[in-house]
Curated annotation (Swiss-Prot):
Transmembrane segments: 152-172, 192-212, 215-235, 245-265, 283-303, 325-345
EC number annotated for this UniProt entry: 4.2.1.134
Protein name: Very-long-chain (3R)-3-hydroxyacyl-CoA dehydratase 3
Matches recorded under SUPFAM superfamilies: HSP20-like chaperones (SSF49764)
Membrane-protein topology: Multi-pass membrane protein
Free-text function comment from the UniProt entry: Catalyzes the third of the four reactions of the long-chain fatty acids elongation cycle. This endoplasmic reticulum-bound enzymatic process, allows the addition of two carbons to the chain of long- and very long-chain fatty acids/VLCFAs per cycle. This enzyme catalyzes the dehydration of the 3-hydroxyacyl-CoA intermediate into trans-2,3-enoyl-CoA, within each cycle of fatty acid elongation. Thereby, it participates in the production of VLCFAs of different chain lengths that are involved in multiple biological processes as precursors of membrane lipids and lipid mediators.
Length: 364
């Protein structure tokens, strides 16, 4: 009898955009769902298989602000996906009106990953419109938006030219010298690569201070990962600078960036070249894993050199007195490379699917 009177609640995961709320209800084989909204409250009740077996599950969520009626939902074999439109397009500091989060509610980290480039463009356009209205009301003849666009255009142009120089240089030398060009790649283009990677710090700063709408974390991870390879693995070890792997690392990095920076450059002047957009969202599929593989090979090749030279190794103080080799940290870094590959590959795939996936169908 106690089980019959008990209200069972499923696990619910949530995320948001400026205009929408996303809820993922962990119920499989759902039947007879009753999903509705009244002002700022979502009502859910359905028969399905959850944590307590096959039962009727229900919950009510009082949102932080008003939402539109008639939520859109989609049933899959494993879950229920619900999309709720906000009444006013804005970012909420939390989902529910009450500050304490319900026990059955948790963030949907897959959805909370960085917004796609298309969503960033929409946010940038909205911010541009608001800035323009504000500046016009103040009677200012100039707009901060134009200055921001000009600054970002020049930044992306400089990076595009730098990586293009590296890419063309390596391509021409390979066509002329063949495999012989592999072994002096570092001494030929390292200065330009140093310049481009140091300038990439600005990209992370731009995201951190709000000049761009890009998320900070992905930019920071790529910056630290590449600079570790460039400055530590290649820069401090002369024995690594004449290895063929340097060519492949630099070539793959530059191949990725010439399309990325050219895409961002055209976005700054409100141009949309469909061919370039397709390349920007597609070429990463082979290039990104190959780039990570080349980085991993460079780390593996450097391990015996660091062991032999003892560089960056240290001995723990008394009473432990254990020598810690730098190669130990390199082995950990190898695991991090492939973990990062998995996370970023999944995220980039979702970006591409959101850009080129099938149009959403409203399912009642």
């Amino acid at each position: 009898m106690a089980m019959e009177n008990q209200v069972l609640t499923p696990h619910v995961y949530w995320a948001q955009r400026h205009r929408e709320l996303y809820l993922r209800v962990e119920l499989s084989d759902v039947q007879n769902p009753a999903i509705s909204t009244t002002e700022n409250v979502l009502h859910f009740k359905a028969q399905g298989h959850g944590a307590k077996g096959d039962n009727v599950y229900e919950f009510h969520l009082e949102f932080l602000d008003l939402v539109k009626p008639e939520p859109v939902y989609k049933l899959t074999q494993r879950q229920v996906n619900i999309t709720v439109q906000k009444k006013v397009s804005q970012w909420w500091e939390r989902l529910t009106k009450q500050e304490k989060r319900p026990l059955f509610l948790a963030p949907d980290f897959d959805r909370w990953l960085d917004e796609s480039d298309a969503e960033m463009e929409l946010r940038a356009k909205e911010e541009e419109r608001l800035n323009k209205l504000r500046l016009e009301s103040e009677g200012s003849p100039e707009t901060l938006t134009n200055l921001r666009k000009g600054y970002l255009f020049m930044y992306n142009l400089v990076q595009f030219l730098g990586f293009s120089w590296i890419f063309v240089n390596l391509t021409v030398r390979f066509c002329i010298l063949g495999k012989e060009s592999f072994y002096d790649t570092f001494h030929t283009v390292a200065d330009m690569m140093y310049f481009c990677q140091m300038l990439a710090v600005v990209e992370t700063i731009n995201a951190a201070i709000g000049v761009t709408t890009s998320p900070v974390l992905p930019s920071l991870i790529q910056l630290l990962g590449r600079n570790f390879i460039l400055f530590i693995i290649f820069g401090t070890m002369e024995e690594m600078q004449n290895k063929a792997v340097v060519f492949f690392v630099f070539y793959l990095w530059s191949a990725i960036e010439i399309f990325r920076y050219s895409f961002y450059m055209l976005t700054c002047i409100d141009m949309d070249w469909e061919v370039l957009t397709w390349l920007r969202y597609t070429l990463w599929i082979p290039l990104y894993p190959l780039g990570c593989l080349a980085e991993a090979v460079s780390v593996v090749q450097s391990i015996p050199i660091f062991n032999e030279t003892g560089r960056f190794s240290f001995t723990l103080p008394y009473p432990v007195k254990i020598k810690v080799r730098f190669s130990f940290f390199l082995q950990i870094y190898l695991i991090m490379i492939f973990l990062g590959l998995y996370i970023n590959f999944r995220h980039l795939y979702k970006q591409r699917r959101r850009r080129y996936g099938q149009k959403k169908k409203k399912i009642h």
